[in-house]
């Protein structure tokens, strides 16, 4: 084998030498290179050795600046968007043509560029475009894109117009002891039709000091004044006001400072932008992923920050609740006296990448008080049973998770409530509180469709007379769950004998007079909910949200004693809803929401709201909401 290899190598060498000899031209035609240059001369540089960094412009094109003359002025291009006046003071002037001082590095100009040669049509995407103060889509000093003072102080001005038209049908009692809206009304429950118009105007001024996007801000001052105008039209008396002479229409307006706070970073906890900050004033806060327990904007002192390269987040907050306006649900300047303490801790990538766990502790102290709302209805204490002012002291222990495990999305929440109620109006005695709540949602994304299923349970009270309140209730919830604002059961406040069977934007049938002004009630029937639904991104601009909820009371013993009806069943009914979100500009600057829903009554709902002929028409509701943001 080794001998054959040597023979082959020798053959290849012979062939290569012969070929080279045939390809070599005669000696007379070969150039003879000069190995050494003549004496006193440099060796010539071949062209292929030239490098771009060593190129020199022709001497004829170079015109030196005269010494002592004015420095060379370079052309100035305007910066992009709307920059406003610079807040950086110049520290020097240009002294020569080689150095041009640029103090405000944020407002560097760029030349105009018509990328496609079309003359910049309105709907085409062009780089290096100039803007105006009223254009939030381009760089704008009013949107925090350029500093207004120095290099690090920015102002973000945000305007929001929220318009809501809500047409709904809810069981509505008549006024059997006073005049009715129409003659010869015999039914206890009259016309269910109601029409609501709500208009909000928000203006947020956010002044903050900071650097880049990933670094937490050093300090912030924020103020949000709000104007609200609302109108309610109903078909029955004593809905807008207990005084039937006030009619069936109510017009209200309200102005307030909804948000106002100052924020300061107290310390950096690591080189990886971990920090701890303090925020004092009226501010938004949501206690968990979906808003099951507490979701509000109110007066607070909040300590918050991150740890372990932003993998962990924490909050410590104390809320001193301000009284709410009845019709706009905005904060008033009146103190309510309710104290809420919250602490939670988040851990990202817990066991599974993309899955976040949360543990929380909450304490609610709601002292005894006596309160009529702006429409002259009694809201504290609840106007049922022996309505005596009472004090609530309740603690909540929570454990939650949100994220995805592989291709499956999961959200879950558990709360255990414990504490004491000095005198529950329904039970007519003091109560020791021990109640639970659990929720879970599973979903799977398939192309442009998300398929969902979820379950919700809040425990009910099985014995109203035993002194132990086991019906779970929240503090001020606003759950984004099982359809959320598109669901009939969550969106509508269904009243029942002076209180609400379920409050607006809540899941729990807690028999409270008002979610925003009443007190938590742990003597309630509780809820079992099973949901199936799907969300579909029909186009990049249009999204559809569909849900079907099956509803049961967890326990009907409280309702049986409250209504003096032993025949109440646990089946509430089936809630069917469909919602649409339309974004005409593919952004959240303009969003139109539309929703329609209906509740197909079950035997339990029928026994509470049936008519003389033992029938209940399925209530239907629809709404249109338009959000325009600058």
Language model: regions and residue ranges:
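Outer-membrane beta-barrel "beta-signal"
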Residues: 578, 616-630
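Bacterial N-terminal signal peptides
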Residues: 8-18
